[in-house]
């Protein structure tokens, strides 16, 4: 008997991750793509069978498909998963396929309220669950500031509108090499001020406002303050933010379970000392009550119960191995000897973020395909 098969948009699968619901995923991409990057959740089971192995039918895998769990078929763009889900439906299984495939999954954003700020202000985190990117929006008295926006610019603009806020400031904590920034485009569309660390902007081909320590930015007519903290190490210009004396937006310098990598501009040996100084001196001198909000997460276990990613600085100094290496030489070896593979198309991404090249939307999607690779564990 033929059963239903339907398309699920990424938001439905996203909710299963946040709600820790069970899901069985049949991933029909090739083995290398699957092992490199897949949809992960607390109670997700996977079966990877390349689509080309299923062209003659699904009979050989039927006994591996559970009947007591929701089944989602996944491929790169959608087409292959539609065909496989149709075959499984014909064989009597109720399944669904991921609309848009992994390309759509990599672009989905989930907004999560992190907390309240002074005088009615709010802090939001945008979780790009398929890529591990984290962006932020500070809203106060009808104004909004965005930090480390991804290229899905209309999502941020529409979100601010929905909150009745005008975007007045857009920041990038550093020149990104793992994903395409939406900061400059958002600023152009909304007439907001675009801020970028000048030491990361020496080759950019557009106008920007230099983001420098000592120049605090006030959001709204209230007392919400964004305080830049020069924190090199991931890049030479990396700059963190203290927001409302509550939150430390650490960019790609410090994550929940890992630390930033210093090599995406080919400068690992030169910048590892800056990375250590930022983590072991600059951050050590900050209030341990600050909640660290990074620009990436590595694993699903880093998500809090409400779906946000963030932990108190004191907890990270206690639990994060990268913050607890007393010997400087050992730290240097940890960083330079354990560098993960470079992000996909990272040099093209850097050039895009400098304004040197302007790839079309489809090319931008291709450039970003793959997992987060900004951390050292």
From Swiss-Prot:
Biological process terms from the Gene Ontology for this record are: glutathione metabolic process; hydrogen sulfide metabolic process
Gene Ontology molecular function: sulfur dioxygenase activity
The active site of this protein is located at 75 (cysteine persulfide intermediate)
Domain (Rhodanese) ranges = 19-114
The record's annotation in PANTHER family points to: BETA-LACTAMASE DOMAIN PROTEIN, PERSULFIDE DIOXYGENASE ETHE1
Which protein is depicted? Uncharacterized protein YrkH
What gene name is listed for this protein? yrkH
């Amino acid at each position: 008997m033929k059963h239903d098969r339907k398309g699920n948009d990424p938001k439905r699968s996203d909710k299963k991750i946040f709600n820790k619901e069970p899901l069985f995923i049949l991933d029909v991409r090739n083995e290398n793509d699957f092992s490199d990057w897949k949809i992960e959740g607390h109670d997700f089971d996977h079966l990877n069978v390349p689509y080309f192995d299923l062209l003659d039918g699904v009979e050989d895998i039927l006994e591996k498909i559970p009947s007591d769990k929701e089944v989602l078929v996944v491929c790169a763009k959608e087409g292959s998963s539609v065909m496989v889900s149709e075959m499984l439906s014909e064989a009597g299984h109720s399944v669904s396929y991921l609309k848009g495939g992994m390309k759509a999954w990599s672009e989905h954003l989930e907004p999560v309220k992190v907390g309240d700020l002074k005088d009615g202000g709010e802090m939001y985190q945008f979780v790009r669950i398929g890529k591990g990117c984290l962006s932020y929006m500070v809203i106060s008295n009808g104004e909004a500031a965005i930090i480390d926006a991804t290229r899905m610019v209309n999502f941020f603009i529409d979100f601010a509108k929905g909150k009745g806020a005008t975007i007045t400031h857009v920041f990038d904590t550093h020149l990104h090499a793992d994903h395409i920034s939406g900061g400059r485009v958002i600023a152009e569309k909304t007439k907001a001020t675009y801020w970028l660390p000048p030491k990361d902007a020496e080759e950019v081909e557009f106008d920007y406002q230099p983001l420098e320590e000592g120049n605090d930015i006030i959001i709204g007519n209230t007392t919400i303050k964004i305080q830049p903290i020069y924190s090199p190490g991931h890049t030479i210009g990396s700059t963190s933010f203290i927001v409302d004396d509550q939150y430390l937006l650490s960019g790609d310098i410090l994550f929940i379970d890992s630390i930033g990598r210093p090599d995406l501009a080919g400068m690992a040996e030169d910048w590892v000392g800056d990375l250590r100084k930022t983590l072991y001196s600059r951050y050590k001198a900050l209030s341990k009550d600050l909640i660290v909000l990074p620009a990436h997460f590595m694993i699903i276990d880093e998500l809090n119960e409400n779906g946000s990613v963030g932990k108190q600085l004191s907890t990270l100094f206690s639990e994060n191995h990268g913050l607890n290496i007393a010997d400087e030489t050992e730290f240097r070896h940890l960083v330079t000897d354990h560098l993960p593979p470079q992000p996909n198309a990272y040099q093209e991404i850097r050039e895009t973020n400098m304004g040197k090249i302007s790839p079309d939307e489809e090319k931008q999607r291709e450039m970003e395909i793959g997992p987060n690779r900004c951390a050292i564990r």
